[in-house]
Amino acid sequence: MQKDGTRSSRRMEEGDRRNGSTGSSGSVSRELGRGFSYYNKYLARLQQNLRDTKRFFRDIKHTYSGAPGGPDTDIKGAEGDLGQLHSITFPRQEEEYLKLTVRCRPCIFILGQSCSSRGRVANSLLGDQLLPILTHCGSECCKRRRIRFRYGKQTLVSLALPEQYELVHELVAHQGKWDTIPEEDLDVPEDEEDPAHRLAELEVTLPHQLLQDVDIVVSPCRSSQAVSMTLEDYVDHVQSIVVYAVCEERLSQQDEEELTEIKEKYKLPVFFIRTSSTRDRLIGGSEGVRSALYEQLMELGFLKRGLCNCGAAGSGSTAPSMLVEQFEKLRQVSTFSRQVLQMHLVDAAIVLNMVHSRCLDLFINKAFDMHRDLQITPKRLEYTRQKENELYESLMRISDRKQEELKDMIVETLNSMREQLLEDAANMQFKDIAIPQNGEPVSVQEVKCCIFQIKELIISRLNQAVVNKLISSVDYLRESFVGTLERCLRSLEKSQQESSSHVTSNHLKQILNAAYHVEVTFNSGSTVTRMVWEQIVQIIQRITWVSPPTITPEWKRRVAQDAIESLSASKLAKSICSQFCKRLKSSHEAFAASLKQLEVGHSGRLEKTNDLWLRVRKDHAPRLARLSLESRSLQDVLLHGKPRIGRELGRGQYGVVYLCDSWGGHFPCALKSVVPPDEKHWNDLALEFHYMRSLPKHERLVDLHGSVIDYSYGGGSSIAVLLITERLHRDLYVGLKTGLSLETRLQIALDVVEGIRFLHNQGLVHRDIKLKNVLLDKKHRAKITDLGFCKPEAMMSGSIVGTPIHMAPELFSGKYDNSVDVYAFGILFWYICSGSVKLPEAFEKCASKDHLWNNVRKGARPERLAIFDEECWKLMEACWNGDPSQRPLMGIVQPMLQGIMDRLCRAQETGKALEDST
């Protein structure tokens, strides 16, 4: 079997008719064509975003892999530098799903109760009588095979195995002209024994405009092949649109089983169309009567009560099934197909955006970690060096002044232990020495061993007592210095990835443990032990015997007494202090050398971390944020459509705000149109959008409903991003001009503080708190808007942004934190307390922005007005303090402001009450 190069081909004589250009069937074809054009437009955008996403992950992988493009290429190869960035990958499951989605071609499956009903639907879709309408509808003897209509420049008919190859077979259609496909070619011959020919489908290629966008597959008769086999052959590599033609009043049991299998196995929505002409079949008539077919579909779970059966989209993630009981309304299949394809695109856009958002959050979290590492590691190193030096000096001072105390401690210890030592010595049982029970003398050698063991007892007891008292005298140093040092070293060791640095850190910890746990011991080779042993030898030499003594308790007690009296407390104290100082100095020098080595290792690591932080902040995160903005905007426009722009509400430096009556179920809305002029503005806008979408809803922040990218803005000359937000009554600037009561103004201040505090808790800095960025609802409650400059501290580059009169002095240095919002609130609070929008005198005198900035840097601030309450003025001054570290946190400002409001408003109410009483 091979491709038939001699198969019949002819051009259709009625090209216009075959292209669906006339009659009601032609309108169905045109409606479907428009729906597929809509699908193809957004599919192209999804494909482009997916290509850009794959390129992004490929670039990340190659940038941080030791062997770009190699077989073992993996971002984990740079895990030492990247940390969390090794998980910035395109998950395989999501990637395969998205690849399949964008490659799948739409396909309309025409199923149904009979060949006649299926043929009628196919003819109507194609606008021509291509399939014969049989009279023996549903006959068991029907053997019609599967039919597939595809696009081709010429009209061709052939037999082919699905997605494989064509069969060499002479068809009736090859023998001459035809308008309707011959029935002989449509049916499987009863005497056909070749299984390939029995399973083959009739493939028809037509130069039909509709077929450029979609294939049409007409299922075979049940006696020829089960419907499930048709779906099984195609469903995994096409976007399925299922049409079910009904020619009877009710579904048969076999129909129900067939539909149940489709629903449970493939979970596909179905468009049901009744092909027979009947009377009074309008669903939802004046009496609200439902047909038997409708009730059956309800029981099967294809239709739901409360949903319009005409195809209105539900709120779920899948398109609903539809029932149309008038064949004249077949054009509604275009609405159904559009919903089905749209939900495929929406699902793909959601998956793609989830990948973008997850990886973008990882980038931002890693930026936080790197930023903190860059800030804290040098401080930890300096802190470790400083604390170790303090510990060293403290211990040296202790050693210098403790010698006399040690002498007294030794004397005191010996006196307190004397009786117990003598008693223990008298009762001592010697090891490895046999003492006669009858009191006979022992040899000189055995006497020496006995004296040595008595010495060992005295030395061990004295050592333990002296060391315990010495350690207790420096315990506070061990707790306050050594514990902190060890914690800092553990932290530095974790952040240093090189193996050599692990050795250095471990060695450093060992030195600390050896040097600073102050364990004074009398080793066998130590000066103290030798000194004590010499004294014991002198004791032995002083005892002269004519013959070896008898080992009695009295003798043991006398030997112990002489040994104790021979010990010199001053010499012992001097020896202990000398040994302690020597070990301390040696350990201090080793510590300093090891710390220097560790610092060198961290210096190289921090340099790499800083480079990576800059790349994440300036390249990786903005690039991924733009892809995220595109995928989320695609999802929003598919679900809710393009918003209708109303009258202009205002304009700012970066965009125009319009009225938008309703969008996505929200009413009313405001629409901010932004046309980014360059890549930097695109990146800033994309990151702003991500931060806003990532924030939990908060009553003191303006809600962002969604975004749409308008590729046709300005006649297609530029691209605009439309941000749809909730619409409020007015901004604070207009509110103050109109006039607001003191209580209302203080409540607005509290609302602003609550909003700023929430942003700070989320790790964000607004950077542009001002009158026009505070919106008021009809109840005069405030919400913060315009997060255009809002960023996490770790993602800030030090850009000079904001509105001049609200900008903190440190903004001009490029090194600042969230305290710039506290400063801006202080200026805003000045306006709130003044009750007007008049500029402060110090700012009004400035002729230019540069003049204003210079004055602010020099300490210029708004003046105190006569109407200001003392506590309000102190709060303003605290907020705009020139030293950022002296400004109060918003968590402190909020209760202070609440107290001011309670006091002032209560005073006002008391005054009014007094006036009323008079």
Swiss-Prot record:
PROSITE patterns: PROTEIN_KINASE_ATP, PROTEIN_KINASE_DOM, PROTEIN_KINASE_ST. ATP binds at L649, G650, R651, G652, Q653, Y654, G655, V656, V657, K672. One of its GO terms (biological process) is embryonic organ development. InterPro entries: Dual_SerThr-Tyr_Kinase, Kinase-like_dom_sf, Prot_kinase_dom, Protein_kinase_ATP_BS, Ser/Thr_kinase_AS. SMART domains: S_TKc. It is found in: Cytoplasm; Cell membrane; Apical cell membrane; Basolateral cell membrane. It comes from the Eukaryota. One of its GO terms (cellular component) is cytoplasm. Its main location: cytoplasm. One of its GO terms (molecular function) is protein serine/threonine kinase activity. It catalyses: L-seryl-[protein] + ATP = O-phospho-L-seryl-[protein] + ADP + H(+); L-threonyl-[protein] + ATP = O-phospho-L-threonyl-[protein] + ADP + H(+); L-tyrosyl-[protein] + ATP = O-phospho-L-tyrosyl-[protein] + ADP + H(+). This is Dual serine/threonine and tyrosine protein kinase. The lineage of its organism: Eukaryota, Metazoa, Chordata, Craniata, Vertebrata. The gene is dstyk.
